[in-house]
Amino acid sequence: MLSLIVLLEKETLRFSQMVLAWGNGRVGASGGIGIHFPNGELQDISLEFDKGCCTNQRTELYAILYAIQYIDDNFDLNKCKVMIKTDSTYSVNSITKWAEGHSRNDWCKRTGEPIANREFIQEIYEYYQNFNIDFEWVEAHTGQTDSESIANAQADFLANSAAKRAARDKKICRPSSSGSKRNSREFYCEKSSKQVYNTPYRSKSRASINGFPIDDDFEIELVKRRSDN
């Protein structure tokens, strides 16, 4: 039985300008994900987040979805068991606890308001229902020197590389010195009811450059069964 470990990282950079936080949901936030295969079964991924409003939660979900799709493109998910380990309780609960009820309610809350991040959650949930995929919450950033922690650091590097590249390439919006206080703070993402439900980009492109500090950890363990032949 082939055991394939996939480590993911996501990063959302926060910019400071005029004593305002430029990141995590505001215009100018930049993010990236990193996917690392310690045993080299697949090529590592360092990818910018370019799916609209950039927040921690959206980048977390995108990292999970992209990894599942990347594995699906290279392996037969019908013959695989995928374990997704993450320190993001939001991501775990969104799929394993809340998605079932939301799907029956046309992806709306009990109040009738559309759920946030539907474009990621709905597709992840479809994979979760149709394939052998499980989620587990784990503690992150243990600071250990074991092989798994070292591999995790490489995933950190990949994510930070992508986030830094995204920050460099993105035009950052800043208020003018004469702008009103109100305008200078209007850089938050629109509410979930106004989000554009775009489709995550299924790319096979890879890139890697210098890194940055990290945020949340994702680990995916894939067990691929041997051929019956």
UniProtKB/Swiss-Prot annotation:
An individual GO BP term: DNA replication, removal of RNA primer
GO MF annotation, one: nucleic acid binding
Cofactor: a divalent metal cation
RNase H type-1 domain ranges (all copies): 42-164
PROSITE patterns, per database record: RNASE_H_1 (PS50879)
Listed EC numbers: 3.1.26.4
Free-text comment on the cofactor: Binds 1 divalent metal ion per subunit. May bind a second metal ion at a regulatory site, or after substrate binding.
KW Cell division (keyword) present: no
Binding site for a divalent metal cation: 60, 87, 156
Keyword Nuclease: yes
Class of enzymatic activity (EC top level): hydrolase
Annotated TM spans: none
Reaction it catalyzes: Endonucleolytic cleavage to 5'-phosphomonoester
Keywords from the UniProt entry: Endonuclease, Hydrolase, Metal-binding, Nuclease
Entry's family note: Belongs to the RNase H family.
Described function: Endonuclease that specifically degrades the RNA of RNA-DNA hybrids.
Name of this chain's protein: Probable ribonuclease H
